[in-house]
C-alpha cells in the first residue's frame, strides 16, 4: 500500500515548476500578454504531473477554463530517456535477451506514443472526438475544448470541478455511489473499445472525475485529460 500511495502522487502531485514560467510559456505560445487573454489567471497550479501542470483561469467572456501547460524542459528530458531506452533495447537484442518481446520494437512504439502525447494540439483533437462519440450520454461528460487557445505546449479546456474515484470521502460528499461510478467508468471504457474503436489508453484514477454539477462520470486529464489515445479498429 505504501508503494501505491507513492505512485498515486505521479498522477497529479508531481512538484510543479514556477507559475511565472507558466505565464511566460502561455504568452510566448499565444503571442499575447496574460492580461489580454484572461480576466484572471492563477499562478499556483491545482494539478501537476510529469509532462505538464494545470492552472485555473477565466476567459474574457467569463468562461472558467483549465490551462494545461507543458513543462519547459520536458522535451529534452524525454529525448534523453528515449536514447537510454534505445541503447538498452539494442544491447538486449544483441545478447538475445527477451527476443520474443522485441525490445527495440517496444521502444519505437513508446517513442511514437510519447511524441503524440507531447503535442497538446493532438490531445485537443482527441477531446473533440471523445465529445462527438459521447454526445448525448447521461453518464459521460467531456469538457469543452478551446482550439483558439491551444498550441503544441498549451491546452485549454473547460474547467469542471470533480472528485477522483479513489476519494471515498469526496464521493460521499457529493452524493456519489462508488460502485456505481466504477460501473459507469467500465461501461464507458467498453463503449470506447467495442463501439467506437477509439479508446482512452491510460484510464487511471487521476484521469477520471465524478462531477457533482453534471451528475455524470467526467473523463478528463489532470495530466490533463486524455493523456494517451490509441485508435484500434
Describe the residue ranges of each PLM region:
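Positively charged, low-complexity/disordered segments
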Residues: 217-233
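Conserved catalytic-loop position in the HRD/HxD motif
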Residues: 202-204
Amino acid at each position: 500500500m505504501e508503494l501505491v500511495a507513492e505512485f498515486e502522487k505521479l498522477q497529479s502531485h508531481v512538484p510543479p515548476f514556477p507559475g511565472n514560467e507558466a505565464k511566460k510559456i502561455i504568452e510566448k505560445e499565444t503571442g499575447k500578454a496574460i492580461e489580454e487573454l484572461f480576466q484572471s489567471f492563477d499562478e499556483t497550479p491545482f494539478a501537476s504531473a510529469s509532462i505538464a501542470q494545470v492552472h485555473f483561469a477565466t476567459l474574457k467572456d467569463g468562461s472558467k477554463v483549465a490551462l494545461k501547460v507543458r513543462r519547459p524542459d520536458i522535451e529534452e528530458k524525454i529525448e534523453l530517456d528515449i536514447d537510454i531506452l534505445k541503447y538498452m533495447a539494442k544491447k538486449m537484442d544483441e545478447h538475445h535477451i527477451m527476443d520474443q518481446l522485441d525490445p527495440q520494437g517496444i521502444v519505437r512504439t513508446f517513442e511514437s506514443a510519447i511524441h503524440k502525447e507531447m503535442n497538446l494540439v493532438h490531445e485537443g483533437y482527441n477531446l473533440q472526438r471523445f465529445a462527438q462519440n459521447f454526445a448525448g450520454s447521461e453518464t459521460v461528460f467531456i469538457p469543452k475544448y478551446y482550439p483558439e487557445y491551444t498550441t503544441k505546449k498549451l491546452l485549454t479546456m473547460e474547467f469542471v470541478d470533480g472528485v477522483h474515484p479513489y476519494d471515498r470521502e469526496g464521493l460521499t460528499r457529493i452524493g456519489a455511489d462508488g460502485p456505481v461510478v466504477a460501473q459507469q467508468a467500465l461501461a464507458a471504457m467498453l463503449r470506447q473499445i467495442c463501439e467506437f474503436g477509439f479508446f482512452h489508453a491510460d484510464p487511471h484514477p487521476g484521469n477520471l472525475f465524478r462531477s457533482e454539477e453534471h451528475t455524470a462520470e467526467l473523463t478528463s486529464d489532470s495530466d490533463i485529460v486524455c493523456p494517451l489515445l490509441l485508435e484500434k479498429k
